[in-house]
C-alpha cells in the first residue's frame, strides 16, 4: 500500500471508529419507533460530526465535516422537544452514557442532571408513564429506577406513576427535576371527569348544575321504572328522579364545601361541641380533683364517685370501643337435644333455660362496661332489672342479622317463624323481632355500633324517674349520665370514621338510636307473654329469671333482691340455676289473672327469713 493510499484511508477509518463507539452506547434503533411529531429530516453539526435523522425511514447518518478542528466531540438528542429550554446538555465528566432516544408525543422525559461537580452515580432522569406500559429510558434508568404511585382514580385504569432512583417516596435529590401530575378526579354521581368540589362532593359541571336546579326549584321528578335506573356518563339524563336520588346518596347537600378550603361560609362564634370538649380533656389528662369540683354537692352522690367519673371522662372513644368489644360474652349452646317438631312446652323450656344462662353472663358483661362497677349496688341492680330483656333481645337480633327469616337463640337452637307460631302468643313477638333484624340488616350494623347500643340500653333504662313513680331514683345519677355520654361519644366517633358525609353521619346516628324504642316495645310484649306462661304453669322458671320477672310484678324497683345482690356483688361461678317448682318449696296464693280469667300462683321467696327478719310482703 502506498503512502498516499494510507493517507487517503485514514479519515475513513477514524470516521468508522467514531461511529462504532457511538453505536455501542446507544440503544437499538430497531426497537424504537421515531415520533410522528417530526416528519421532516433534520441535520445538526456538532464537533466535526454531522448527524442527519431520517424520521420516515427510522435511520441515522453520520458524516465528517471537512472543516472540523480537533475539538472535543459532544452529543445531543437527535429529536429534541419543541421547547428546547427544558433539555439540558450532559456536562463534562458525566457518567451517563450518550443515548439517542426520540421523544414521545405523549410522555416527555425530563433530564435532571446537576451542574458540574455535583453529579452523583445514582442520578437518573424522571419519567411519567401509565402503569403497565413501556417507557423510553436508558440502560442506567432500567437498572436503578423505582416506581412510586402518584394518583389513581377509583374505577379507572389510567394510574400515573413517577419513576426515579431517589427512594420509595419518589422525591428527587437536591438537583433532581420532576414534573407534577394534575390529580384526576371523577364525578361521584355519573363517573365523568369532575370539574371541582361542588355541594360537598367531587362532581362534574352537569351534575352540579342539575343538583342546583333541583334544590332551587320545585322538582316533581317521577321515575318511569323501578327507581333503580343506572346513572352514568351516557345515561345520566335518562331519569331525573334517579339522578337526584343518587346525588343525595353520594352526599351532595346544599351548602356543602371542601373542608380544606372552607368555602364561602360565614363563621360564627359557637361553643365547641361536647365531643370536642371531651377530646380536649383527653389530651390535657384531666385529674380527678378537677372532676370532683364539678360534681353536684347535694349529698346524693356517693363518697367514692369522683375517681370513677374521672376515669370515665378521661377515656378516649377508641378505649371505650375496645373495652366494650372485649366485654362481649361468648355465644352459648342449648346443650339439650329434642326431636323436631318442637312442642309448645319444649320451646318454652328451651327458651327459658337459655335466658337464665344468658342472665348470668349478662351480669359479668355489665361489670366490664366502663364505670359500671363504680356505681352503688343499688344502682347496678336497678339498671339490670330495668333492661335485662332488652339486652337479651338486642343480642338475639345481632346473632340473627345474617340469617334472614330465622332467629338464632343459640348455636344449636335456631327457630323460624313457623316454629314460633306453635307457642300461644309468640307469633306477634316473632314478627316484631324478624322485622327489627331486617332493619338492622339494611343498615349494615357493625359490631362497634352494636356494643355501643347495648351499653346505652343498660344505662338509659334508669336514667329518668318521676315523683309519682314507685321506682327510687338512681343514687349516682350524675355518674350514669357521664357514662352514657361517653359511650354515645364513642358511637358518634365510630360513625364519623366511616367516610360518609356529615349529613349521612347524623342520619345514621338517628336511625340507630330510634330502633331502641322498638326494642323496648318488644321487651314489654315479651315480659307480658312470659308472665302469662308462668301463670299457666306451662314452663319451669329458674331462680334468676323468676327474680327478674317478679321485679316488675310483685316488688317495686329499687329494693335489692337477695339473689340479684348476691350475683352482682360477686363473680358468677355457675352457668345455670335450678328451676323453681310450684309444689315443694314455694308457698302459693291464688290470685285472679285479669287477662284470661285463670288462677295465677304468686310465688313468694322459697327460703324462710333469717333471725331478726320479717317475711317479704
From Swiss-Prot:
Family the entry assigns: Belongs to the nuclear hormone receptor family. NR3 subfamily.
Region (Disordered), start-end ranges: 1-54, 269-303, 568-617
Biased composition (Pro residues): 606-617
Keywords in alphabetical order: DNA-binding, Lipid-binding, Metal-binding, Nucleus, Receptor, Steroid-binding, Transcription, Transcription regulation, Zinc, Zinc-finger
GO BP of this protein: cellular response to estradiol stimulus; estrogen receptor signaling pathway; regulation of immune response
Tissue expression remark: Ovary and testis.
Domain NR LBD: 316-552
Protein task: The steroid hormones and their receptors are involved in the regulation of eukaryotic gene expression and affect cellular proliferation and differentiation in target tissues.
GO cellular-component term (any): nucleus
Protein name per the record: Estrogen receptor
Region Modulating, annotated ranges: 1-186
DNA-binding region, residue range(s): 187-252
Coiled coil ranges: none
Amino acid at each position: 500500500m502506498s503512502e498516499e493510499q494510507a493517507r487517503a484511508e485514514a479519515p475513513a477509518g477514524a470516521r468508522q471508529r467514531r461511529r462504532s463507539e457511538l453505536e455501542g452506547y446507544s440503544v437499538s434503533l430497531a426497537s424504537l419507533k421515531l415520533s410522528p411529531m417530526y416528519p421532516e429530516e433534520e441535520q445538526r453539526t456538532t464537533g466535526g460530526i454531522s448527524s442527519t435523522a431520517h424520521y420516515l425511514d427510522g435511520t441515522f447518518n453520520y458524516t465528517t465535516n471537512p472543516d472540523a478542528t480537533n475539538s472535543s466531540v459532544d452529543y445531543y438528542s437527535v429529536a429534541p422537544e419543541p421547547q428546547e429550554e427544558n433539555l439540558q446538555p450532559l456536562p463534562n465528566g458525566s457518567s451517563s452514557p450518550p443515548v439517542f432516544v426520540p421523544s414521545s408525543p405523549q410522555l416527555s422525559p425530563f433530564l435532571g442532571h446537576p451542574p458540574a461537580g455535583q453529579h452523583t452515580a445514582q442520578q437518573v432522569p424522571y419519567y411519567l408513564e401509565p402503569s403497565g406500559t413501556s417507557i423510553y429510558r436508558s440502560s442506567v434508568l432500567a437498572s436503578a429506577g423505582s416506581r412510586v404511585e402518584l394518583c389513581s382514580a377509583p374505577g379507572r385504569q389510567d394510574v400515573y406513576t413517577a419513576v426515579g432512583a431517589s427512594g420509595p417516596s419518589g422525591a428527587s435529590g437536591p438537583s433532581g427535576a420532576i414534573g407534577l401530575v394534575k390529580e384526576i378526579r371523577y364525578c361521584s354521581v355519573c363517573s365523568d371527569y369532575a370539574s371541582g368540589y361542588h355541594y360537598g362532593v367531587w362532581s362534574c359541571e352537569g351534575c352540579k348544575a342539575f343538583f342546583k336546579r333541583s334544590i332551587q326549584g320545585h322538582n316533581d321528578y317521577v321515575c318511569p321504572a323501578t327507581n333503580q335506573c343506572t346513572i352514568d356518563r351516557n345515561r345520566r339524563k335518562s331519569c331525573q328522579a334517579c339522578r337526584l336520588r343518587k346525588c343525595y346518596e353520594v352526599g351532595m347537600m346544599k351548602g356543602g364545601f371542601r373542608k380544606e378550603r372552607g368555602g364561602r361560609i360565614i363563621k360564627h362564634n359557637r361553643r365547641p361541641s361536647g365531643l370536642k370538649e371531651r377530646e380536649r380533656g383527653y389530651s390535657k389528662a384531666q385529674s380527678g380533683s378537677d372532676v370532683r369540683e364539678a360534681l353536684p354537692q347535694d349529698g346524693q352522690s356517693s363518697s367514692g364517685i369522683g375517681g370513677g367519673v374521672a376515669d370515665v371522662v378521661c377515656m378516649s372513644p377508641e378505649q371505650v370501643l375496645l373495652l366494650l368489644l372485649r366485654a362481649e360474652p361468648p355465644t352459648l349452646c342449648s346443650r339439650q337435644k329434642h326431636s323436631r317438631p318442637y312442642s309448645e312446652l319444649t320451646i318454652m323450656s328451651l327458651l327459658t333455660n337459655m335466658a337464665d344462662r344468658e342472665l348470668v353472663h349478662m351480669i359479668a358483661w355489665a361489670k366490664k362496661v366502663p364505670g359500671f362497677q363504680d356505681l352503688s349496688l343499688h344502682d347496678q341492680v336497678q339498671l339490670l332489672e330495668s333492661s335485662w330483656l332488652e339486652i337479651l333481645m338486642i343480642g338475639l337480633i345481632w346473632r340473627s342479622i345474617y340469617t334472614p327469616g330465622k332467629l338464632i337463640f343459640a348455636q344449636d337452637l335456631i327457630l323460624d317463624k313457623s316454629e314460633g307460631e306453635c307457642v300461644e302468643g309468640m307469633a306477634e313477638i316473632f314478627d316484631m323481632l324478624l322485622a327489627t333484624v331486617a332493619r338492622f340488616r339494611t343498615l349494615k350494623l357493625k359490631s362497634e355500633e352494636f356494643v355501643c347500643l347495648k351499653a346505652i340500653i343498660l344505662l338509659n333504662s334508669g336514667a329518668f324517674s318521676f315523683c309519682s313513680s314507685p321506682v327510687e331514683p338512681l343514687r349516682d345519677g350524675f355518674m350514669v349520665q357521664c357514662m352514657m355520654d361517653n359511650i354515645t361519644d364513642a358511637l358518634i366517633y365510630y360513625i364519623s370514621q366511616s367516610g360518609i358525609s356529615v349529613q349521612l353521619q347524623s342520619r345514621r346516628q338517628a336511625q340507630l338510636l330510634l330502633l331502641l324504642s322498638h326494642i323496648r316495645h318488644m321487651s314489654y310484649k315479651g315480659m307480658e307473654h312470659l308472665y302469662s306462661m308462668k301463670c299457666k304453669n306451662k314452663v319451669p322458671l329458674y331462680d334468676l329469671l323468676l327474680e327478674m320477672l317478679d321485679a316488675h310484678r310483685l316488688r317495686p324497683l329499687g329494693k335489692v333482691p337477695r339473689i340479684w345482690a348476691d350475683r352482682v356483688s360477686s363473680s358468677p361461678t355457675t352457668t345455670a340455676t335450678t328451676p323453681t317448682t310450684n309444689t315443694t318449696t314455694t308457698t302459693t296464693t291464688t290470685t285472679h289473672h285479669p287477662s284470661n280469667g285463670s288462677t295465677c300462683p304468686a310465688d313468694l321467696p322459697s327460703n324462710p327469713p333469717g333471725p331478726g327478719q320479717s317475711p317479704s310482703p
